[in-house]
C-alpha cells in the first residue's frame, strides 16, 4: 500500500530510498576496505581511527588501484564477492520497490493533472480505467462548522474474481478513491477524530492530491477485500475564521476504482486490456514471446508483407494460425474485471445561528398554538355562561 504523499517523481519516498542506498553502500564500502588495513591510505594511517574513512578513501583514490591490485587470499575474495552480491540484491529490491510505488494509482493522476476533475465533470482516472463500475458515497445531510464528520465510500465488486497482474499472473483486486471536497474542507487531524471513528477508519492513510489542494483526498491502492468500504474523516471549515467560506450547500465528488487500468498515461496499453490486430491479413505464425508468457503473432498482409504484433503476458488468445483477420480485430479476450465509477453528493454547512433561530421559531409556534387553544376554551366558557343566564 502506498502510504506516503508523493507529489512529484523526486518526492519524499524517493529521497528516503536514496539515503537508504547511500547508507547501505557506505556500510559495504567500510566492510570491503577493512579487509585490507595494511595497504589502504598509506599516507594517512590515522584514518582508521576516525570516522573519515570514506572521505579519506575518496581523497586517496590513486591508492585504490594499488589496493585492488594486492594479491588476495581466497577467503578475502569470497568476502568481496558476497559483499558485491549483497549490494546488487539490495539495489534491485529498492529499485523494484521504487518502480512499483511510482506506478501505483493515483500517482498517475497526481503527476499528470493539476486538477483531477475536468471541466466536463469527468474525473481523470477514467482516462486509464475504461470500464464503468458503480461506487457509493454516503454523507450527512448537514454539518456544523469546525466539526468532524464521516464520508463513507463503498466500492462494491465480486471478491471471488481475480485480475491479471503486471507479470501476467492472477491476483486479488486493489481499490482506490479520490474524494473532491469543497474549498475549506479538509482531512481531519488525528487529535480531532473521535475514537469510534478511528476504529472505522482503521489503518487507512489518506493523502492530499497536492500541497495546494488539501481539499482533494486520494487513497490507494489498498486491498479490496479489506477496504471495499472506506471511511474518510472530514473536518468542516468555520466561516467565522475563514471569510472565504459561506454557509451554503456544497457539492462533493467521488471517483473510485477497483482493479488495474487499461492504459498508461503515455498512451501505451497495459496487459489488462484487449489487444487488436494492427493490420489485416492472415496469421502465419504464433510463437511464445518469453518464458514468462506472451505471444508474437506474425500477420501476412495481402501484399506479402509480414507484421509482428506483440502481446504481453495476461490476455488469452482467441485467434489461431491460418485465420484471416481484419484491421483492429480482437486478437485476445478482455481480461479486465475492474472498473471506475463516479458519484456526486451534497452537504450543507449549517449556520448555528440559523439553527437557534429555527428552534426559537418552533417554540414560538408551539406557544402560539397553546394560547389559541386556551383562548378558545375561555371563549367557550363565556358563551356557556351567557346561555345559562
UniProtKB/Swiss-Prot annotation:
Cofactor info, note text: Binds 1 heme group covalently.
One GO term (biological process): photosynthesis
Superkingdom of source: Eukaryota
GO annotation, cellular component aspect: chloroplast thylakoid membrane
An annotated Gene Ontology molecular function: electron transfer activity
Topology relative to the membrane: Single-pass membrane protein
Pfam families registered for this protein in UniProt: Apocytochr_F_C, Apocytochr_F_N
Record field: transmembrane: 355-375
Known cofactor(s): heme
HAMAP family: Cytb6_f_cytF
Protein name: Cytochrome f
Organism taxonomic ancestry: Eukaryota, Viridiplantae, Chlorophyta, core chlorophytes, Chlorophyceae
Gene behind the chain: petA
Amino acid at each position: 500500500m502506498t502510504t506516503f504523499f508523493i507529489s512529484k517523481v523526486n518526492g519524499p519516498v524517493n529521497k528516503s530510498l536514496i539515503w537508504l542506498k547511500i547508507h547501505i553502500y557506505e556500510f559495504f564500502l567500510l566492510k570491503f576496505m577493512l579487509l585490507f588495513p595494511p595497504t589502504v591510505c598509506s599516507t594517512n594511517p590515522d584514518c582508521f581511527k576516525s570516522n573519515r574513512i570514506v572521505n579519506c578513501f575518496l581523497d586517496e583514490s590513486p591508492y585504490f588501484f594499488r589496493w585492488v591490485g594486492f594479491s588476495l587470499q581466497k577467503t578475502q575474495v569470497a568476502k568481496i564477492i558476497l559483499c558485491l552480491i549483497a549490494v546488487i540484491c539490495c539495489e534491485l529490491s529498492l529499485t523494484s520497490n521504487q518502480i512499483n510505488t511510482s506506478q501505483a494509482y493515483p500517482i498517475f493522476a497526481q503527476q499528470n493533472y493539476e486538477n483531477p476533475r475536468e471541466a466536463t465533470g469527468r474525473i481523470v482516472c477514467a482516462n486509464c480505467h475504461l470500464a464503468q463500475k458503480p461506487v457509493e458515497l454516503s454523507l450527512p445531510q448537514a454539518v456544523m462548522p469546525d466539526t468532524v464528520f464521516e464520508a463513507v465510500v463503498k466500492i462494491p465488486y465480486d471478491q471471488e474474481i481475480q485480475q491479471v497482474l503486471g507479470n501476467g499472473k492472477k491476483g486479488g483486486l486493489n481499490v482506490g478513491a479520490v474524494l473532491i471536497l469543497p474549498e475549506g474542507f479538509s482531512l481531519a487531524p488525528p487529535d480531532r477524530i473521535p475514537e469510534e471513528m478511528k476504529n472505522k477508519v482503521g489503518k487507512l492513510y489518506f493523502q492530499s492530491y497536492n500541497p495546494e489542494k488539501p481539499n482533494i483526498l486520494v487513497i490507494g491502492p489498498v486491498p479490496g477485500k479489506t477496504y471495499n468500504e472506506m471511511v474518510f474523516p472530514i473536518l468542516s471549515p468555520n466561516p467565522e475564521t475563514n471569510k472565504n467560506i459561506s454557509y451554503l450547500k456544497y457539492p462533493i465528488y467521488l471517483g473510485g476504482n477497483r482493479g488495474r487500468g487499461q492504459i498508461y498515461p503515455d498512451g501505451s496499453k497495459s496487459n489488462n486490456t484487449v489487444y487488436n490486430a494492427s493490420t489485416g491479413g492472415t496469421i502465419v505464425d504464433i510463437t511464445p514471446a518469453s518464458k514468462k508468457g506472451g505471444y508474437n503473432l506474425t500477420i501476412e498482409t495481402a501484399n506479402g508483407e509480414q507484421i509482428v504484433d506483440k502481446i504481453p503476458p495476461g490476455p488469452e488468445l482467441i485467434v489461431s494460425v491460418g485465420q484471416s483477420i481484419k484491421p483492429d480485430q480482437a486478437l485476445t479476450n478482455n481480461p479486465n474485471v475492474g472498473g471506475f465509477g463516479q458519484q456526486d453528493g451534497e452537504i450543507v454547512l449549517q449556520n448555528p445561528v440559523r439553527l437557534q433561530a429555527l428552534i426559537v421559531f418552533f417554540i414560538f409556534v408551539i406557544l402560539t398554538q397553546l394560547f389559541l387553544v386556551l383562548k378558545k376554551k375561555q371563549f367557550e366558557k363565556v358563551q356557556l355562561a351567557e346561555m345559562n343566564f
